[in-house]
Design a protein with these regions (language model features):
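Conserved beta-propeller blade signature
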Residues: 2-4, 39-41, 87-89, 133-137, ...
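Residue-level "micro-hotspots" composed of small/polar
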Residues: 9, 21-30, 34, 60, ...
Length: 392
């Protein structure tokens, strides 16, 4: 512990375990992506797109310019995706889909008379499959795929497919080439080889339902577990045994409204919510095949930008550093440097009140001194039987 004496400002103290997360204020952060140079691209809520050069810390701002066709289509950026060819895809609210490549913006918008265009200008989620097809989740227009080479769109909605709902909130492509589609009314899964969609409300057997069907993010970890963030808790699905575990506040979750999921280099999970950050360590019982989950909670007292984080605004960088975005900027951290203090602090009494008045050291009550030294150094306190109203 480092103690600092100040001029007229009292005593300050610092320990590395107190503030665990570095903070950068860059506005209300809604999305984070990394390019091939290790630079950060940060989407904001109505403040445009920020290109943050990681080596110099210099930000470059992209905003919508009405008179400039080569500019961002909307300052409300909702999601970002860097594809394998190095292009940056930018989902916006109200402005459709942008693609940024070598200083040029290409815009994709809904055109009412063109059924092969974007179905909705509110883009919520993006993903790229192994064929280079960009998958697009919209807010009301269903799921779409875009072939960047031809500019051709294909649409999947509740009318043309078994999609659970037309508001798509999250997209994730699993190792077995399935597209996990989180919607406002359940989870859909597409086999990318056949384009067949099935929808789930819980386990395949029907034994357990998701805690809530309004899904904020879907994520597959290195174990093959499917993590599902909802408005009413975190759902963890083990497809090997068709078992669903639901974590709530009583299980150590920071808040029921979970919004973001990411796995660190140690195969542990970090979950953002409306009230803080939860670090989850999964532990496997080899006999039963079941997992137990240990949770640690962090909030503003640990250096977080605030307790509130934005939906899917979380990213693990190529360096292993994790970036999480919220209403007051981003926090960055390496999970190995977050130390959890398992030593319980000693309990100290700091005040002793007799008849609602604090007893001072050396002060005489009646004919005797009750405290001859500071309270935390006293083994016992002797009182007269009439001195029967006290508190510590």
């Amino acid at each position: 512990m480092m103690w600092l004496g100040t001029w007229k400002k009292g005593i300050s103290y610092y320990h590395e375990s107190i503030f665990k997360f570095s903070l950068d204020y860059v506005g209300d952060v809604t999305a984070v992506e990394e390019d091939k140079n290790g630079d950060l691209w940060i989407g904001t809520n109505n403040d445009g797109l920020i290109h943050w050069k990681i080596n110099t810390g210099e930000p470059q701002l992209f905003v919508r310019e009405v008179s400039d066709a080569n500019s961002l289509s909307s300052d409300a950026v909702s999601c970002l995706l860097r594809t394998r060819d190095g292009k940056l895809w930018i989902g916006t609210l109200g402005g459709g889909l942008d693609c940024y490549d070598n200083g040029r913006f290409t815009h994709y918008k809904n055109m009412v008379k063109n059924r092969k265009s974007l179905t909705d200008n509110n883009i919520v989620a993006l993903a790229e499959d192994k064929s280079g097809i960009v998958w697009i989740g919209t807010s009301g227009g269903g799921l779409q795929s875009l072939n960047p080479r031809t500019g051709e769109f294909n649409t999947y909605n509740t009318t043309t497919s078994d999609l659970a709902f037309n508001t798509v909130s999250s997209l994730y492509i699993t190792r077995d080439n399935s597209l996990m589609i989180g919607t406002s009314r359940g989870l859909s899964v597409m086999d990318l080889s056949t384009k067949k969609i099935i929808s789930l409300t819980g386990t395949k057997s029907g034994k357990t339902r998701f805690s809530n069907q309004n899904i904020n993010q879907v994520y597959e970890d290195s174990r093959g577990l499917i993590w599902i963030a909802t408005r009413e808790g975190l759902n963890i699905y083990n497809p090997k045994i068709d078992e669903l575990t639901i974590l709530a506040e009583k299980n150590g979750l920071s808040n029921l409204l979970t919004v973001g999921i990411v796995e660190d280099d140690n195969s542990n999970m970090w979950i953002t919510s409306a009230k803080g950050l939860t670090h989850i360590i999964p532990m496997l019982d080899s006999k039963t095949g079941m997992y137990d989950f240990r949770c640690n909670i962090y909030d503003e007292r640990d250096g977080l930008q605030s307790s509130g984080f934005n939906q899917r605004s979380v990213k693990k960088l190529s360096s292993g550093e994790i970036v999480i975005g919220g209403v007051y900027g981003i926090n960055r951290f390496f999970s190995d440097k977050i130390k959890y203090n398992e030593v319980l602090p000693n309990v100290f009494f700091t005040h002793f009140l007799l008849f609602n008045k604090e007893v001072e050291v050396g002060e005489v009550y009646g004919d005797k001194v009750i405290l001859d030294k500071a309270l935390n150094f006293v083994d016992q306190v002797e009182l007269d039987y009439k001195q029967n109203m006290f508190c510590v």
